Amino acid sequence: MPREFSREKRSASDSTTTSKRKYREGSEDSLPAKKKKIHPPKHEHNHPSVNELKKRIRDVKRLLNRVDLPADARIVQERALAGYEKDLDDELARRHRSQMIKKYHFVRFLDRKAASKDLKRLLRREQEISNSDLDRAAKKEKLAALAGKIHAAQVNHNYTIYYPLTQKYVALYAEQKKKKKESSAQSEKPNEPEAEVVSKLIYDTTGERPPVWRVVEKCMEDGTLDLLREGKLDDGEGEKSSQAPEQKKSKKSTDDDQSTRNKSSTEKVSDKASGKSRKSGDKQDSKPKRSAAMEGAYWSANEHDNDDNESDGGFFEE
């Protein structure tokens, strides 16, 4: 290879490397450095652990069962026990609330969508009637007939929003597929779909509204819908208020059952002990009775033998 060609090749390679270095190291022509995305820190929920709270409650109860515990330490532990039990109840209630929200989220969404659609339709109809050129009497009559439907639609809409989150949700609407005729309807309107999903109120067919519906209507008048949704209202809690005395009654019944079981067990033990003592006494009493009977039979047999001996001796003697 000639030297000139090698020098040209080297010069070309040096120029490419220098151009790359210039492109990399230069401030004007170089590409901007990629910035690292700074992710915000995740919000960590500092919820207590249920197992940890239960463990603490067991430890405190075990400590309170000690007889030699000082009075001041006992007071401190009793306060701690009350606090742990309250934290446990709050955590269980929070978990139950989140579970019920996840369970009925989609059903509530569909009901809210249908209720808002009905309410908007009725309000549009009311505006059309009020802007129409009808007589005052006819207009008044139609608006009065429409006012009841609007009120029911407003209650339905608030029912879907402010239903208590901690209770089982009872749906208001049921979806039905409405099929269309295939003959002249398709020829006239070919762009319309064959089936349409229609949501209808359940209590229109059954004639019975859910029990919470009346509570929502009353809360609309009182302005306590938020309390109803959070379950802080006496009427809205329903199940909670009924569950609390039932739990107390069940606790009392369990305590009574345990006391009766303990009494029955002690009575059984005492009956067993008395039965054993009676059996031992009967055995002791039966032993001398048997011995007396045996002795009587023995003496009677001996007397009979003596009589026989005397008679035999007299018979053979002459």
From Swiss-Prot:
Where does it mainly reside? nucleus
Q: Where is the composition biased (Acidic residues)?
A: 305-318
Comp. bias regions, Basic and acidic residues: 1-12, 229-288
Q: Which residues form a coiled coil?
A: 49-69, 111-146
Query: What does the UniProt entry say about where the protein is found?
Result: Nucleus, Nucleolus
Please list where the region (Disordered) is annotated: 1-52, 181-203, 229-318
Keyword entries, A-Z: Coiled coil, Nucleus, rRNA processing
Q: Which terms under GO biological process does the entry name?
A: maturation of SSU-rRNA from tricistronic rRNA transcript (SSU-rRNA, 5.8S rRNA, LSU-rRNA)
Q: Name one Pfam family in it.
A: Efg1
PANTHER family per record: RRNA-PROCESSING PROTEIN EFG1
The family annotation for this protein states:
Belongs to the EFG1 family.
Function, in words: Involved in rRNA processing.
Question: Under which name does UniProt file this protein?
Answer: rRNA-processing protein efg1
| Source organism of this protein record | Neosartorya fischeri (strain ATCC 1020 / DSM 3700 / CBS 544.65 / FGSC A1164 / JCM 1740 / NRRL 181 / WB 181)
Underlying gene: efg1
